[in-house]
Amino acid sequence: MADVTIRNLNFAYEKREILKDINLSYELRDFLAIFGPNGGGKSTLLKLLLGLLRPSSGTIEIVGRSPALARAQMGYVPQFIAINKSFPISVLEVVLMGLIDKKIFGFYSKSEREQAMQALERVGMQSLAG
């Protein structure tokens, strides 16, 4: 059984079809590249996988669960974020920005900070947390 399975996935913004009949399965340790032209639906597909959007039809399963239920086990680093690049920011704060359930004004719980530190530890970057 694949860790991520997408079956007959369709998605439309209003009446504009963005993704049509997507079928895909892969194991979590596999490498996967998603590429295509601007407006081709790459970011939309990622948002569907994260449970930030709901498909018009079809199913997505991540380790046998819906994206909403699997969300706590996923991380996401957006391509663009709205920050002033000259403003000092720590590595830990950058990791916290990747939380799916973002906080207003950057107030994160102790649990969220611990979760971010664990993520940094998994990739050997805890000493850079700041």
Positions of PLM-derived features:
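Conserved structural motif at the start of ABC-family nucleotide-binding domains
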Residues: V4-I6, I18-D21
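ABC nucleotide-binding domain signature
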Residues: A33, A72-Q79, L92, L96
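The feature captures the beta-strand-to-loop junction immediately N-terminal to the Walker
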Residues: F35-P37
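Helix-to-loop junction immediately C-terminal to a conserved catalytic motif
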Residues: L50
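Conserved ABC transporter NBD signature motif
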Residues: G58-A70, R122
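Conserved ABC ATPase "signature" region
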Residues: K110-A129
